[in-house]
UniProtKB/Swiss-Prot annotation:
Name assigned to this protein: UPF0735 ACT domain-containing protein NT01CX_1681
NCBIfam families: PRK04435.1 (NF003361)
InterPro entries the record matches: ACT-like_dom_sf, ACT_dom, UPF0735_ACT_dom-cont
Gene3D superfamilies (alphabetical): 3.30.70.260
Protein species of origin: Clostridium novyi (strain NT)
Family of this protein: Belongs to the UPF0735 family.
Family matches, as HAMAP family: UPF0735 (MF_00707)
Domain ACT: 68-143
SUPFAM superfamilies per UniProt: ACT-like
Amino acid sequence: MDKYLIINTKILPEVFGKVLQAKELLRTGKAKDITEASKIVGISRSSYYKYKDFVFSVLEGTHVQKATIGFLLSHKAGTLSRILDRIAQINGNILTINQDIPVNNAASVTITFDISNMVVELNEFLREMQEMDNVVKVSLIAME
């Protein structure tokens, strides 16, 4: 039985990220074939073929329905509301919200939501959240 892991690309050899980039170019039609996609991202065709069936982005090839994300938020009015608004904009559906009382002007919030109909990749959403004002920390806790 195969085992699957979710691993941050920061610790992987660069070739794995480039294979994902090539697959995205092919999926979106920005590259007409594997030769062109491989050339654009800077890998050999043999590297692409070697890893293409073993490297996937978080949502690619899976039937993930839910994500649980932890946030550490500055205690500023409207911060949680902006996060919830963004989840709604990308077709996420909130399932649970747990919020701790702010301590030292920061509150921990855990949100579980349905990601099956999201119109952006989860990675992109996490990046957006990390860059949002008054968001101190964002972490992916679980996916089902």
